[in-house]
């Protein structure tokens, strides 16, 4: 065989090998390009566009130990197969679903970076069942915590402290294409004040935020040490049931700004930093029922800033400064509640009007029912006020509080007082 022939054969072989390598590279590129799991290093964010995906799918697709890996346990010198460390944010795209459940996850620990919170943001659906999701600080081998001297009541210094700490959060976005269901799980040490508004910290990064995802469910969870607890804006048709909500920095449950058609039932809400359950700013068609709420610095249950056509019933509220507080809201009903050991049992205040307060048991308050500051045309009837320490019924007529109706209220060990 001539050398010329050898050169031709060698060239042909090189071309063939090159072609095969090119085909393999092109195939891999296409597979990556068409994958429903991708990673944006610039944003440090994992994108999920799969119809259904879980953490094993993400791990298999990305194979990137710097952003997602199983936890190594030094005591056993082995990997905990169901404890995951996430060092990035996640975005669930429209029409996609991310499943985080006990089949492959026991505990998801999310590490915030120095510049980003590394949130889970949902434009599709999120399904969480029987897992624990928290922030994590690998340097301290502990949750990401706010300094102990941060107190909501000291708003200026607290805001400075809160804004210095970044923590991951879960946020369901306004245009989410499906419901999010979080149940039987523990959500803790999430949320921060990384997004500020004129008068404080935005609820957008507050910890567990639902701005969309019609027919979502939050059920049978432990929710604690979250910055703002549960928060929603414009959310509709949602069930919040059977949760323990406690030790959150500001509020326990805070439906906000146009939230509507929501049921908040059978939750235990206690020891949060300011208010237990507050619905504020144009919320309507909210039912708050069957909850036990206690031990907050300010208020147990509050209707605030134009809340209307809503109900608080069959709740047990105790050991509060104000057990139930209706402020600047109208056409609501407060009935069949038991409130006890509060400075004020039921406060109707700040131009609240046309509300009905009836069939409530108000036990050992300082003031039983307190009506003031322009609250008018409200009805109070068939309430039982037992052992009020100071005043069973207080009506501040000097501040344009008028046209309120009181009928068939029972007062034991005290007499009504008009100031």
Model-found features: residue ranges?
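Ankyrin-repeat and related helical/solenoid repeat scaffolds used for protein-protein interactions
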Residues: 340-402
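Secretory targeting signatures
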Residues: 1-31, 185, 334, 357
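Hydrophobic alpha-helical segments, principally membrane-spanning helices and signal/leader peptides
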Residues: 4-6, 10, 79, 321, ...
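Beta-strand/loop edge motif enriched in small/polar residues
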Residues: 24, 28-284, 288-289, 294-318, ...
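Detector for the Zn2+-coordinating histidines of canonical Cys2His2
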Residues: 243, 291, 337, 360, ...
């Amino acid at each position: 065989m001539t050398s010329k022939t050898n050169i031709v054969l060698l060239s042909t072989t090189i071309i063939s090998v090159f072609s095969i390598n090119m085909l393999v590279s092109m195939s891999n590129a296409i597979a990556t390009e068409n994958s429903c799991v991708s990673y944006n290093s610039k944003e440090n964010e994992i994108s999920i566009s799969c119809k259904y995906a879980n953490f094993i799918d993400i791990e298999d697709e990305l194979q990137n130990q710097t952003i997602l890996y199983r936890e190594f346990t030094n005591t056993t010198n082995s990997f905990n197969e169901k404890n995951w460390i996430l060092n990035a944010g996640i975005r669930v795209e429209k029409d996609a679903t991310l499943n985080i459940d006990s089949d492959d996850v026991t505990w998801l620990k999310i590490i915030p970076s120095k510049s980003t919170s590394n949130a889970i943001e949902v434009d599709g659906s999120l399904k969480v069942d029987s897992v624990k999701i928290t922030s994590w600080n690998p340097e301290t081998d502990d949750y990401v915590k706010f300094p102990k001297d941060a107190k909501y009541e000291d708003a200026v210094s607290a805001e400075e402290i809160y804004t210095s700490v970044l923590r991951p959060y879960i946020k369901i976005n306004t245009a989410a294409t499906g419901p999010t269901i979080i149940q039987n799980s523990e959500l803790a040490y999430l949320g921060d004040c990384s997004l500020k508004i004129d008068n404080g910290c935005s609820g957008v990064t507050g910890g567990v935020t639902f701005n969309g995802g019609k027919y979502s469910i939050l059920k049978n969870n432990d929710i604690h040490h979250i910055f703002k607890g549960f928060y929603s804006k414009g959310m509709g048709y949602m069930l919040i049931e059977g949760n323990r909500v406690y030790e959150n920095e500001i509020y326990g449950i805070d439906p906000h700004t146009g939230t509507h058609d929501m049921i908040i039932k059978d939750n235990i809400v206690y020891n949060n930093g300011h208010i237990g359950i507050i619905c504020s700013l144009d919320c309507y068609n909210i039912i708050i029922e069957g909850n036990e709420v206690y031990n907050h610095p300010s208020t147990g249950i509050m209707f605030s800033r134009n809340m209307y056509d809503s109900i608080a019933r069959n709740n047990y509220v105790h050991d509060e400064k104000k057990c139930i507080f209706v402020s600047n809201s109208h056409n609501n009903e407060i009935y069949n509640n038991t409130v006890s050991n509060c400075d004020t049992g039921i406060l109707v205040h700040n131009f609240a009007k046309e509300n009905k307060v009836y069939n409530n048991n108000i036990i050992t308050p300082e003031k039983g029912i307190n009506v003031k500051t322009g609250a008018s045309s409200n009805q109070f009837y068939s309430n039982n006020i037992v052992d009020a320490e100071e005043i069973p019924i207080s009506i501040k007529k000097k501040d344009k509080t008028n046209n309120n109706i009181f009928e068939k209220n029972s007062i034991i060990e005290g007499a009504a007082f008009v100031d």
